[in-house]
Amino acid sequence: MSQPLNSNPEVLLRKRRNADRTRLEKQELAKKRKEQEEKQKRSKKNRFVRAETIVATTLATEREKTRIRRVRDLENQKVKNDLSHIPSDRDFILRISEREAGSKATSESELQDVDEEDEEDDGLIREKIVYDGEPSLLFVIRVKGPTAVKIPAKAYKVLSLLRLVELNTGVFIKLTKDVYPLLKLVSPYIVIGQPSLASIRSLIQKRSRIMWQRPEDKEPKEIILNDNNIVEEKLGDEGVICIEDIIHEISTLGENFSKCTFFLLPFKLNREVSGFGAISRLNKLKMREQNKKTRQISNAATAPVIQVDIDSMISKLN
């Protein structure tokens, strides 16, 4: 049996005094934390910036603005059907995947797609194909852009539309003729690929989050999606009553694809390499070298959109 509460006035006063002291200590800690944050903001604002840093940032940002302007002008000419002075009116996709151990690229098509400098065995297969406009499922991951670049307003607006403002977040999108130019605009800041059903299921079961307002809450809050009742309440009118239905709609590009994807918040993924130790630094160098091979940034307006093996990347970040 539970013991009755102690109603001794001395005990109650002591508890109240301890509670008041704890509350005051928390308020003092919160005040100190706020002062520390303001101090850090002031120090960052007044931080000395070297001239070469300003020059590098300016030049890199100007190059990025030039690339975006070229892509925009090319797409405007395509819309106006003015194809007389453009290099190509076709859209290309460059698929980069790791070569299986023991296999060699000996076919003529593979040899044509590989540049001379890449003919040294780097363990990658590059396949350049023409995008025919058929809808396909892509998973897009937001990554760090080129060094010293301030993201131009047009590219940032596209990233906001895709809900990819934060680094290491990902969303499912349907690739169409209208979406392709948007991916070209933000290609230096994203990594894309076609996910398998296993990757889709793994992401949704492990990383799915939604905004949900409980009866006792004043505002919607971010929660983990692990209840089929919530899915049925929000998407039941569309015939989606459980998490498995969401997985099916996304993997098959069903009629309710957009409603299911916008019902889910962007997936927050782990960093591929974290830490400041010697091994972490070595892994960061390896990752940087690998990114140079797979994330080839080009300023040409007709540069292809690069697709990578997104399943292996999801397995590392999930």
Curated annotation (Swiss-Prot):
Pfam families associated with the record: Ribosomal_L30
Localisation per UniProt entry: Nucleus, Nucleolus
Record GO terms (molecular function): RNA binding; structural constituent of ribosome
PROSITE patterns xrefs: RIBOSOMAL_L30
Regions of compositional bias (Acidic residues) in chain numbering: 110-121
Broad class of the protein's primary localization: nucleus
Keywords assigned: Nucleus, Ribosome biogenesis, RNA-binding
Biased composition (Basic and acidic residues): 19-40
Gene Ontology biological process: maturation of LSU-rRNA from tricistronic rRNA transcript (SSU-rRNA, 5.8S rRNA, LSU-rRNA)
Cited function: Involved in the biogenesis of the 60S ribosomal subunit. May act as a specificity factor that binds precursor rRNAs and tethers the enzymes that carry out the early 5' to 3' exonucleolytic reactions that generate the mature rRNAs.
Recorded family membership: Belongs to the universal ribosomal protein uL30 family.
Name of this chain's protein: Ribosome biogenesis protein RLP7
